[in-house]
Amino acid sequence: LHRVDRRQRQMCIRDRYLYSAAQTLGITRDEMMDQLISGKAKYSSIFNYPTPTWADMGAIGWLVDGAAICNQVPLCRASYGPYGRAMVRVCKEESFHQRQGFEILLSLMQGTDEQKQMAQDAVNRWYWPSLAMFGPPDDQSPNSAQSMKWKIKRFTNDELRQRFVGMLVPQAEILGVTLPDPDLRLDDETGQYVIGEIDWDEFFEVLRGNGPCNAERLERRRTAHEEGAWVREAAAEYARKQALKTKAAA
């Protein structure tokens, strides 16, 4: 449990990095929070899937955070400095999460038949959503071309997805899990893996707010924001009083 707690704290710190980078573009944190809880702001589609067992923690770490690392390491060299510097810190944390997830799955795969099945079921749940995290195919991506032009992104969605699959296959063999893609194969001519068709209809439905947990996630965020109002108000009042003391002492 202490590892889960550490992970949650790191996620909060990561949010601060990214919100701070976004603030350099002229938007306030309050505005971004209002956009989030109103449903206007987009956020990663992967956060809208349920986690029914402990094995999901392992699959999320290995697959989801592994995909995030593959996507975010090149962003450390993004043309926009505040974003690139934030990514350097984020990637250091993601590497811990990825190793933690791999370790959880490895432990389960060395356990009972029930534990092995639990690990495999979790991999089955998270494999395809993790591949979709890189975004639509290059010929259907509305933002990739502009991001590449501005040198925010250095590789296309499909290039990053291919790299990710290339890393997953040998790791899956070590774990002893099966990647749930009957069409997955190595192309001898290109040396790259060919994957099955991703369900892009599901991906876009989740982005539209119709995923398994979209409504629940936003409602919890709204509730936390409302119940935490007194903390923000107290902090603001404390800052005001400290400013008055500093001014009086000057």
Q: Residue locations for each model-derived region?
A:
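Short, contiguous, pocket-lining structural segments
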Residues: 57-67, 86, 93-97, 160
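Inter-helical turn/loop segments and adjacent helix faces that build the functional surface
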Residues: 71-89, 103-118, 136-150
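Active-site-adjacent scaffolding segments
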Residues: 15-78
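Single conserved hydrophobic/aromatic residue that forms the stacking wall/gate
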Residues: 1-13
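Acidic/His metal-coordination segments adjacent to aromatic residues that form catalytic metal sites
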Residues: 35-61, 111-115, 126-152
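Extended, helix-rich structural scaffolds rather than catalytic motifs
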Residues: 117-250
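Alpha-helical scaffold segments in carbohydrate-active enzymes
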Residues: 10, 14-20, 89-107, 122-132
